[in-house]
Regions:
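Conserved hydrophobic helix-helix packing surfaces used for dimerization/oligomerization
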Residues: 7-9, 30, 302
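Conserved Rossmann-like nucleotide-cofactor binding loop
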Residues: 15, 38, 168
Length: 461
């Protein structure tokens, strides 16, 4: 493989920027093309999530490019979920019994800007903004772009082309339109959408609610969440059905209806949201979708990566982390198979596909768990037990969440299989009152491990 080879990357979001940086560090010539303006110079959020959950799998990607120290000041640790009930009472549920394991809230814009700055420092990389991809020649790694303002068309090419252009990927649509490919794609959208709102920084206390947690207001069919920002504000997201159910976005059209809804379901949050009506009226309602597709490449010339290959809903906080892990896996495959792009692309998909399918499924599972079950007594009982196991026996037990979020050395698929079996085992044992207080914690763990093994073997009844 000639390190002078030219890689054309379509999409300069988080995945594309990290990929461009790593490939440039490896010596490839990089052209990174983005349809939006430079986010370092203008606000282009357009309803996209302002901050993101950043955890071990994503940190692995940042470590690969040597940016761990530069990323740390951008992070706010979140040690667990703070559950808010309708009366304003709270219940803190740690993410792990191990206090050194936590997730971070990080600004999408700050992290993306850091990556773009690092790409620009390298002489073998260039970034071109405001170029909207209109057409892709997948078999020759060429693409036609149209300037956002002038509408002038430009053709760019590389030795290979990688599409990191997000859930609505033009590169993926080109694969879907190619009748020679036998391309398969599924797009599944929830009946729910989301709307970004805010809790501003306080005047006396900087943070109006507890800083180091992901706040959740679970309300059955709908829910509110909040993540902290460095300036003391919180990014609040309302997840709600578009039209179905007793409460939905369609019903919340007037100032009166919006306020009445929040007074009934989120009274303690409403007290901290002076800009609710303005935010609700001005910010878009955005869809929540999962994309799965295959194959990810065309003849060793074009490849999909990140959300363009496997968009997921945000309920495991793994979208960015999964995309960053894509770059890590791709980098490992390059080490193993350098010299043949077809072999590299095929091997990359072989190693990655089952894991990205798994996190897509897990994210939908977690959506239902967060909005419906986090407030349920049996769920809280289960979490207390899991936390106790992790505190006392950290090497012998890991909850599903811990397997997915903090055990980055195992794949999402393995984490899902083990975690689902373990969840079913614990809930079944609790329902049958087989984990009574008369048992010691070690005995309870042995029962859980035995039941989990039977679940995995298909012999648990």
């Amino acid at each position: 493989m000639n390190k002078k080879e030219h890689i054309l990357i379509v999409g300069a979001g988080l995945c594309g920027s990290l990929l461009a940086l790593r490939m440039a560090q490896r010596g490839f010539k990089i052209t990174l093309v983005e349809k939006r303006p430079d986010l370092r110079k203008s606000d282009i959020s357009a309803g996209r999530s302002i901050n993101l959950a950043f955890s071990n799998r994503g940190i692995k990607g940042i470590s690969l490019v040597g940016l761990t120290k530069k990323t740390e000041p951008l992070c706010i640790p979140m040690n667990g979920r703070m559950i808010h009930d309708k009366t304003g009472e709270t219940f803190f549920s740690p993410y792990s019994g191990n206090k050194s394991e936590y997730i971070n809230s990080i600004s999408r814009t700050d992290l993306n800007a850091l990556l773009l700055n690092e790409v620009e420092k390298l002489p073998n990389a260039e970034i071109i903004f405001q170029q909207d991809c209109k057409d892709v020649d997948l078999k020759s790694a060429k693409a036609v772009f149209e300037h956002f303002e002038t509408k002038k068309k430009t053709e760019l090419s590389g030795d290979i082309l990688i599409g990191t252009d997000g859930a609505g990927s033009v590169v993926r649509q080109s694969m879907e339109a190619d009748s020679d490919m036998n391309f398969r794609v599924s797009e599944y959208f929830l009946e729910h959408g989301y709307k970004e709102l805010s809790i501003p920084a306080g005047k006396t206390e900087k943070y109006r609610i507890f800083k180091n947690a992901l706040h959740i207001w679970p309300r059955g069919e709908n829910m509110l969440i909040a993540l902290p920002n460095l300036d003391g504000s919180f990014t609040v997201t309302l997840f709600m059905s578009y039209k179905k159910g007793e409460q939905n976005f369609e019903q919340l059209k007037s100032e009166k209806s919006i306020k009445a809804y929040f007074e009934e379901f989120y009274p303690d949050a409403l007290e901290q949201m002076p800009d609710l009506i303005k935010d609700f009226s001005q910010n878009p309602t955005s869809p929540l979708g999962t994309v799965k597709c295959s194959p990810w490449n065309v003849q060793g010339k074009s490849l999909l990566m990140g959300d363009s290959a496997h968009a997921i809903v945000p309920f495991y906080g793994q979208g960015m982390n999964a995309s960053f892990e894509d770059v890590v896996v791709f980098d490992e495959v390059l080490d193993d198979f350098e010299g043949n792009w077809q072999q590299i692309f095929d091997e990359y998909e072989k190693r990655r596909k089952k894991d990205t399918d798994a996190i897509g499924d897990l994210a939908i599972d977690n959506f239902h768990e967060m909005k419906e079950h986090t407030a349920a007594p049996v769920f809280q009982q289960k979490r207390k037990l899991e936390t106790a196991f992790e505190q006392e026996f950290p090497d012998e037990f890991a909850s599903k969440y811990r397997l997915v979020t903090f055990r980055e050395q195992i794949g999402y698929n393995q984490a899902m299989q083990r975690g689902r079996a373990q969840d079913k085992a614990i809930l079944k044992l609790l329902e049958n009152n087989e984990l009574s207080d008369s048992l010691g914690l070690k005995e309870k763990l042995e029962k859980v491990n035995q039941a989990t093994k039977k679940m995995l073997d298909g012999t648990f009844s």
